[in-house]
Amino acid sequence: MAKILVHVTNGPENPTRAALAFLVAKSAIDEGHSVSMFLAGDAVQLMRKAVLDNLAGLGTGELRAHFDAIVSGGGRFYLSGMSSKGRGVSEEDLRSIPAEFAMPEVLVRLSLEHDRMFTY
């Protein structure tokens, strides 16, 4: 199966697009693909528990349900270190999440290692 990278820059200010990115990632896992997600800009805030537990998109579902399915399916999360620092997202926010902070060169490397890339 394919390796899919989903690059997300929309955060809580655009819940429908944010949830859509996670729905697409979940759908790829459901189809048997390997998925990585790179969150940058406002999207890094999606990893906060309060946001995960409460965000729902119009017609794109609940963020928590999609997130849990991605984690269960072996998905990996990368958060822009600079975006996270600027928005106060810390190691504590990522404590129980399969995620790591990453710099732009990691996004470039991931884009080359994956077969397809979706951007939201």
List each language-model region with its residue ranges.
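A glycine-rich helix N-cap at a beta->alpha junction
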Residues: N54-G81
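Anion (oxyanion) recognition and catalysis
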Residues: I29, V71, S111-L112
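Short, flexible loop segments at the rims of nucleotide/cofactor-binding pockets, characterized by
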Residues: D53-L58, L94-P98
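Short internal beta-strands
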Residues: A25, V35-A40, F77-G81
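Histidine-anchored nucleotide/phosphate-binding helix
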Residues: A18-E31, M37
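Short, glycine-rich nucleotide/cofactor-binding loops
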Residues: L5-A19, V51
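C-terminal structural segments of small proteins and small subunits
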Residues: G86-T119
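N-terminal beta-loop-helix "entrance" segment that forms/cooperates
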Residues: A43-G57
